[in-house]
Amino acid sequence: MKTGISVLTRSMALMAMLFIGVLPISVMAQSILEGRVTDQQGKPVEVAQIVVNKSLSTITDKNGRFAINGVPSGEVEYYVNCLGYKEQRGVVAIKGKRTQLDIRLSRLALNLAGVTVTAKQQAMGSKSLIDQQAVRHIQPKSVSDLMQLVPGSLTSNPSLNDLGQATVREISSNDNNAMGTAVIIDGTPISNDANLQAIAPTMHGKNSAPNATDMNNQTTAGRGADLRTISADNIESMEVIRGIPSVEYGNLTSGVVIVKTKSGRSPLEAKLKADPYSKLLWAGKGFSLGNGTMNVGLDWSQSYADTRRHYKGYDRITATMGYSTIWGQGSKRPVTFNLNGSFYSNVNNYKHDPQMTELQLEYKNRNVGGRLSAHGHAQLAGAFLTGLDYDVSGQISRTVDDHRDYVPSPDGVISNSMVSGEFPAAILNKAYYSNYRIEGIPLNVFAQVKVNKYIKLGHKNDFTNVKAGVEYRLDDNRGEGLTFDMAAPPKAGSAQSYRPRSYQDIPALHNLSFFLSDVSKLKMGAGKSWQFDAGVRLSNLFLDKEKSGQSGIFVVEPRANTEFTFLTKENNNFFDQLSISGGFGISNKMPSLFYLYPDNAYFDNVSFSALGTDGSRLAVMTTTVVDNTVNPELKPARSTKWEIGLNARIGRMKGYVNFFKELHRNEFGYQSEFIPLTYTKYSIETGASQLAYNNGKVTYVNQQGELKTAATSTGYEIQTWGRPNNNQRSDKYGIEYSWDFGQWDAIKTSLVVDGAWFHIKRKNTKDYLSYVQYGYDCIPVMPAGTGTVSDRINSNFRFVTHIPVVSMVFTTTVQVVWYENTRSIYEDNDGNNLYTLSDDGTRYMVAPLYFYDIKDIKDIKDIKSIDWDPDFASNPRYKQMVHQYMLYAFKNDRVNPWALINFRFTKELGNHAEVSFMANNFLAMSKYHKNKYSTSMRQLYPDSYFGAELKLKF
């Protein structure tokens, strides 16, 4: 730990000196930019945000007034946004000591021109902005529904029955991608690092149930945060950083989802959403409170995966509040203050099936929690610094998995020993009910402070904004963990058994970070400019060395984005703007508690069992405990990204194309390890009675009345368990694009075409144990390199028809998948195939690297590895260890092009009502893809889906 702390301390000191070194640079005259923001009727707009050159910001007070101190003279760009109003951008010339800027905003309404209901590309970097109008039109149930507007995504029907995971640049779901996607709400990251909701990670990995019920995948342990806890109706806007994020954001690999909730005044609104599978009610209002505004919301939803099976249901209640104000408006150092809170209660049920009711079975997952955060900005005019941003938050939840299972045929002997040894055991040879509970109480604390120095450079609109910050995160779990009656375990007599485990014994995670960045914009001549965002982030995760095997993990993350604009109206007559952008960045996702502190592995072997009555009934169990299941070499998952893109605007048309390359290394998983088990086996004579176990011996009385000691022999067995490991990697290449053709006025319709080509190659990176069959006395170790390669090219043609005169907008989306291909691979690090063709040409084969021979082993110390000899492939005893594959196993599985049509409609009914309708695959297209080799089938089109929404305003 001392090494990590010293490196972090020295690095922070160096970065602090670099930051302090730029403070005296600014010598330009500074001014106060002040003014008033009103609506079209001249009424003040409260809590409107004003941002200058993406660096200086404030909000308006209850009179609509604002003031930004320390604005250097010259031209500056600004933008203003507020809940319920259309965003406004412009340029203002700063002159003298005070510059007046009065802004008049238009309310968002469908009778106004310029409605945008698709994701917008943000400058410099791969970022998609989904604003108020798009959120309103998409009719989401959760945050994950909004991800469909990101280029490369395909249509999926809104559902609350499945986990809501955010993935970036993915073809199919992937746990490491979801885990590496940071979700930030109002400046606060939603942490899932303290989630331990799994029954036995060393045995079942991430599942919360040992059996294949619909409830064993409701946990997000080892995955990303469940986005169903966020009310989609309380979202004002959302930004998705697909590429390289600023160094302000940490503990991630895939991307960032930034959610801004509603703040400011708004009319009382009530919504009713309904579809064949669910119903949702929401009400919210924003109102003045003292010198600020309060915005509150409440929603209730109920969803079923199948309307014929109401025993598979999901219920959600969320409540949100947000208070915003500004202190010291008009002073040299005004401070904005935002307080946001939320409460949620989610319940998954699986219990009302008639058959389950008859068997008295019940599975339930409950998640109740809340978040509270305070964040804001302080202007520091007259000081060495320009401003200070602060963010403090706390999150706590209680997740409970309750399972009542029926164990129809137990193996007979159970043990409650928590330590290794030989002990008397209980006999359980009748069917029974097992009740077990997994309780997790994850607690997360986050604090971040950022300071910046805004410096006006020589040209009238050139600037640099240097920013430094420090961040602290705490992740802990205070739940009781896995609990059950040891006399009625979830499984009985298994070779690997369950034991209760309290999460309160697991150390908390402490993560300290420091970052330094610079955002600059420079004029490079007529019509040319260059801007960049570059910085470095240092992070240290402090660990309990005694329990994790390491004292800490230290990472350095350099990142940079840049954009060079070389054509504008100033130097050509065709392009309004043409620029090239690029970036490079390294990001790390620290391992969570789930991977750092796995449970012990328990193995129970029956040494003796006699199912008699009274004196002829006895059981002895040998328990072996593996208590060193941690991986002291566990590393953070790391991503390295490169990007280059082209952005253009020609009249009413605009768009971009972006190429990216991503290398993801050290991704998390569980790796099998074997353990040789040795135990004493006791045998007695027929007709024995008065069985007893004392001092490590089984005694009995034979039929002649003689006291005897049971004969002994040694039993041997090999079992496996899972250890956390960095055993996966992903390589990604692709092209993302979007082109907005603008509106054709004659038909009031615009066309936006977006899509992507994704190429994703995934494979395991660790040699692994292979199970052949029960009773086989060799354990092969296979080479790493199994995986898949997937490609997909898709386009979305979004026809947006907006008719202001009737306050209506409808969108017809034609989704086309031009190319889709998947194949399995088995290759080495250089890409060479590890499989070879058999001598008769009927199959492919992969031989082990080595194996363990346990035949006739009398002592576990005698087990040794034997390198594989090619001649073993023809040996009847050893050839079973060779993996065999059909000739088509590594062939391409290509899907023919396919398309579907979706429709969304929104209509305002006066000033007090709005109706919306959506239909996915409304032509009821149905197509299954059949693998021509394996004949397996999979559905291409989502099921037809119809939903409606009614909103009332008061």
List each model region and its residues:
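Short acidic/polar hinge/loop motifs at secondary-structure boundaries
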Residues: 188-241
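Short, acidic, small-residue-rich periplasmic hinge/interaction motif at the N-terminus
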Residues: 36-43, 48-51, 81-85, 95-136
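N-terminal periplasmic accessory domains that precede
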Residues: 100-104, 143-146, 165-167, 183-184, ...
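C-terminal beta-signal and adjacent terminal beta-strands/loops
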Residues: 209-211, 664-666, 816-885, 895-898, ...
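Transmembrane beta-barrel wall of Gram-negative outer-membrane proteins
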Residues: 235, 271-302, 310-395
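Extracytoplasmic beta-strand/coil segments of soluble accessory domains associated
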Residues: 144, 148-211
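Gram-negative outer-membrane beta-barrel transporters
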Residues: 526, 681-828
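Face-selective signature of the C-terminal outer-membrane beta-barrel domain
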Residues: 327-345, 363-547
